[in-house]
Amino acid sequence: MLQKETIEPGTLELLKQLQREPLLQSFNLVGGTALALRMGHRKSIDLDLFTREAFDLEEVTEMLVHHYGMKVTYARKQTLKGFINGIKIDCIRYDYPHLNTPDTIEEIRLESVPDIIAMKLSAIAHNGSRIKDYIDIANLSTHYSFNTMLEFYT
């Protein structure tokens, strides 16, 4: 069951709409919002949608701009970032093998928790400047040992 109180109703509805789009069928929700919906440990305001498949950046950008009024802030090399109705949206190709099959819960496609842990640890290792990544890992440490989380990452 999703912890829907962790995101605004409009954000959840936008997520459902985006995941119904044919051009976004390979994209899954990742990051803090995916964890918040699963675990209920914090509020989250953005939508990170990742795919492992190459996508037509121009076609996806055009669809999001025309159908949703996306204000694009960055579009290059399999990465699209912007805002729809003030909600930050990232559509990114993240090419690494799945640890587990993505889940679909209440119409939402989410990466598995082990996959998200690997992404969070990668973000900390490469940047380490976002407090929310540490909050997420701290919460996850109540469910997974640190060694287990490191195994997901390596």
Q: What residues fall within each predicted segment?
A:
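Compositionally biased terminal segments of proteins
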Residues: M1-T154
